[in-house]
């Protein structure tokens, strides 16, 4: 691979090739990033809902046990 780029100017290696790669694989990169972000968002919502459920159940259990003590 290095033999291919040896005679070329620096801007071909560092500007043109990455730009061409982004143009060719840009849709794939965007879809993968979108999938990962969506998955992380769903995971965050899941954790928040489970945490809220645990909080509500503990709050309810503590209030019902304190009522039975009376």
Curated annotation (Swiss-Prot):
Q: Major place of localization?
A: membrane
Q: Which Pfam families match?
A: DUF5326
Look up the record and report any one GO term of the cellular component aspect: plasma membrane
Give the UniProt subcellular location, in the record's own words: Cell membrane
Report which superkingdom the organism of origin falls in: Bacteria
Its name, as the record gives it, is: Uncharacterized protein SCO3924
User: Keywords assigned by UniProt?
Assistant: Cell membrane, Membrane, Transmembrane, Transmembrane helix
Sorted alphabetically, which InterPro entries does this protein's record hold? Uncharacterised_SCO3924 (IPR020246)
Transmembrane residue ranges: 19-39, 40-60
Q: How the protein sits in the membrane?
A: Multi-pass membrane protein
Q: Which residues form the signal peptide?
A: none
